[in-house]
Amino acid sequence: KAKGERLQAKGRNTRLHLRNVFLMAVSWFFYYKTSGLFLLLLLFVTLSDWLIARRIYEAKSRESKLAKWWLALSVIIDLGLLCYFKYAYFFTNVVNDLLGTEFAVFDLFAYIGNGFSESGRFMVDSIILPVGISFYLFQVMSYTIDVYRGHVQPVKNILDFGFYVSFFPQLVAGPIVRANEFIPQLYRPFRLSRRLFGLAIFWVLNGLIKKIVLSDYLAVNLIDRVFENPLLFSGFENLFALFAYSLQVYADFSGYTDIAIGIAMLMGFY
């Protein structure tokens, strides 16, 4: 009987692992179709933070001060990548204006994609921002910080960690998922009751209403018209359009978040 229970548990764990690997492969393919070569950046971040988190845990278990240095390395790598892709133009322009230099941002990914040729050396205003970079970088940072604080143990299997980082419903537009909330669900059997199915459909429809009915309607029928020709409208109408723009941004992100929550629930994650 005990042997049968062990075999049953082993089979269940194998099915869970295969499910996670399949969803991770789908997520990577999804990101490749939206971002192309920037999939390499996602894979690099996944590998580096998985390795660093394990070093942090080992150092903490020995009460070594190296844990802080490993955490600092993780933060430097993640924030360095974020600053490079999001703020390289800004800082380069500031330096050029102050010092009269002619520095340009070197686009490594364009260089690789162009076959290691000089055509990959883009000017300052040519570098492309990877899709969802802010979300997955802050997510892996929250993971290493949680490991350092002892809120979660490091993931042993890199494929499971890769799934946590790249899960496609929240990869592009969030929400950012905390490791101590999501990772335990990787090893939980799939369960979707009638109530959870109905709740998931509600979240998806709620997000679609926010996005299509509210956000897109405001953008097309009010905000774009006023912003394109502000002098044709009164001061009150311009002010109203500014408030409507804030509502549009909220409805966009909130709608995407609701849709991501609903899709994740349909797959057994909530």
Positions of the model-derived regions?
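Membrane-embedded transmembrane alpha-helical bundles that form the catalytic cores
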Residues: K1, A9-Y270
